[in-house]
Curated annotation (Swiss-Prot):
SMART domains: RHOD. It catalyses: uridine(34) in tRNA + AH2 + O2 = 5-hydroxyuridine(34) in tRNA + A + H2O. SUPFAM superfamilies: Rhodanese/Cell cycle control phosphatase. It comes from Rhodopirellula baltica (strain DSM 10527 / NCIMB 13988 / SH1). This is tRNA uridine(34) hydroxylase. PANTHER family: RHODANESE-LIKE DOMAIN-CONTAINING PROTEIN 7-RELATED (PTHR43268:SF3), THIOSULFATE SULFURTRANSFERASE/RHODANESE-LIKE DOMAIN-CONTAINING PROTEIN 2 (PTHR43268). The active site is at C207 (cysteine persulfide intermediate).
Length: 323
């Protein structure tokens, strides 16, 4: 188990990963990617990125900031890997191949799970709101999926899910602490109120694809925690690499696209999203009398006003018509 930096270790796609082998006939590739790397001229990348994605029929969202790139995108299988190669080999005026070490997690599906192509400029590629944190300077120790079970079995390890409530609701690792956050901005407050380097000598954290843990482990290191670990590549990498019979994962993994969640085979799961409150819905929840597609569910129906219902119904009609 070694400490390294986010932009220094390329995460290449194997010739045939377990996820790819189990999805050989699926025509769409989905790439969840990130890379912490200095981008002083990140604003200038927006248009060439958007144009290349549009030309290749790739949809989804990329975030660009002075600290790097983050996003999830999807497109025709035969065009996605060349696009990732294009990113990794890109040379900028002031840098040679800044995205060479970009971390990428692959999954596959029948249809592109995004409606639009977006390239956005941000202050942070994952918003924690702590300006002193720099994952390029210091992060926790990366743990490979095959070593994760042994680490979390250690009784001295405090295991923390750094994701938000609505994500944890549908799946997590057994024994993990839920910080009960609504956004990643709330995570520092959770740490301040609940964790102590003396009482919690070993802390292990995980998230969907690894990016939040780059900052959460850096934050704990800054606050004096010495043994801080995080799952390399996040839950998605664990689900790909770990045989299901040996897995400690329980449930499905929330993803930020129209699939809503993926199962242990990284295939679209059983959940849909309530567009009223943004929480995932089981098939059983959709049978509730308060559920109305695109409008509300039993969790939020009592808070939805008449005008909100009217607007949401109109929007759902537009979506159904492909507008």
């Amino acid at each position: 188990m070694t400490e390294s930096h986010a932009s220094s270790v390329p995460a290449e796609l194997p010739a045939e990963s377990p996820a790819e082998a189990g999805a050989a006939d699926l025509p769409v590739a989905v790439a969840a990617l990130y890379c912490f790397t200095p981008l002083p001229q990140f604003e200038s990348l927006r248009e060439p990125f958007r144009q290349r994605m549009s030309d290749d029929g790739i949809r989804g969202s990329l975030l660009l900031a002075g600290e790097g790139i983050n996003g999830t995108i999807a497109g025709p299988r035969e065009l996605m890997e060349p696009f990732i190669d294009w990113l990794r080999s890109m040379e900028l005026d002031d840098q040679a191949t800044p995205f060479r070490g970009m971390d990428v997690k692959w999954s596959y599906c029948e249809e592109i799970p995004f409606r639009k192509t977006k390239v956005r400029l941000k202050r942070e590629i994952v918003t924690m709101g702590v300006s002193s944190i720099d994952p390029l300077r210091s992060v926790g120790t990366y743990i490979e999926p095959q070593d994760w079970n042994a680490l979390v079995d250690d009784p001295d390890v405090t295991l923390i899910d750094t994701r938000n409530d609505y994500e944890i609701e549908i799946g997590t690792f057994e024994g993990a602490i839920n910080p009960h956050t609504e956004s990643f901005r709330e995570f520092p407050k959770f740490v301040e109120e609940n964790l102590d380097p003396q009482k919690h000598p070993k802390v292990a954290m995980f998230c969907t694809g690894g990016i939040r843990c780059e900052k959460s482990t850096a934050y704990l290191k800054e606050r004096g925690f010495e043994e801080v670990y995080h799952l390399r590549g996040g839950i998605l990498n664990y689900l790909e690499k770990m045989p299901e019979e040996d897995s400690r994962w329980q449930g499905e993994c929330f993803v930020f696209d129209n699939r809503v969640a993926v199962d242990h085979q990284l295939q679209a799961g059983a959940y849909e999203l309530c567009h009223g409150c943004g929480w995932p819905l089981t098939p059983e929840m959709k049978q509730h009398s308060d559920y109305e597609r695109g409008v509300a569910c039993s969790r939020c129906a009592a808070e939805v006003t008449y005008e909100q219902r009217k607007r949401r119904r109109m929007r759902q009609q537009q979506l159904d018509q492909g507008v």
